[in-house]
Amino acid sequence: MLQEVVYCGICSYPPEYCEFSGKLKRCKVWLSENDTELYAKLYGNEIDEEVANAANKLGSSSIGEAREEKLEKDLLRLQAKQENREQRELAKKLSSKVVIKREARTKRKFIVAISGLEVFEIDMKKLAKTFASKFATGCSVSKNAEKKDEIVIQGDVLEEVEKYIHSLLEEKGLKNVKLEIIDSQKKKKKPTDEANSNNNNNNNNK
């Protein structure tokens, strides 16, 4: 009757030859866990301290590998979640718009109000200071009718503000964001200009 030959799961040698594999400690651990009778035959009934320590280390290593694998999966999941959130934020930004409005004030003076910038994580107060310095005029941040922050600039600087906001958004990679320009009251001709224009037309008709 043929006797079944056992081969070590670590070095693939028969257990009797594991000492020549250079992996004896791990081989003994494997054998103690998979064939206690053969282990007892080769090494005695008691598992020596060295084998027990090796078994503990291997166990810890397995736990460490499992933990590392779990951490890696969690990290990938968090990265995917972060990417999805960033994509949603970008879509929100691209679908938003910045409103630049020119309004007439008394004595033929104008103000320019800018709203909608908070979506793009722009520091409104800092930008207001930049405008105040750039245009040498009064500039402040206040709440509009929709209870949202808007920058109010004293002066007729609509075109300059539009160009500046365009370049500011382009720097943030948002050149496709819509700018809505509202001119609530076009600049009117001075009465003297209108009178002169009418006189010229009358003279030409003579």
Swiss-Prot record:
Localization of this protein: Cytoplasm
Protein origin, superkingdom: Eukaryota
Subunit structure: Interacts with the 40S ribosomal subunit.
A Gene Ontology biological process term: formation of translation preinitiation complex
Protein name from the UniProt record: Translation machinery-associated protein 22
InterPro entries: DENR/SUI1_TIF, DENR_C, DENR_eukaryotes, DENR_N, SUI1, SUI1_dom_sf
Single GO MF descriptor: translation initiation factor activity
Record's compositionally biased regions (Low complexity): 196-206
Main location: cytoplasm
CDD domains from the UniProt entry: DENR_C
Domain notes: The SUI1 domain may be involved in RNA binding.
Disordered: annotated segments: 184-206
Annotated ranges, domain SUI1: 98-169
Entries under SUPFAM superfamilies matching the protein: eIF1-like (SSF55159)
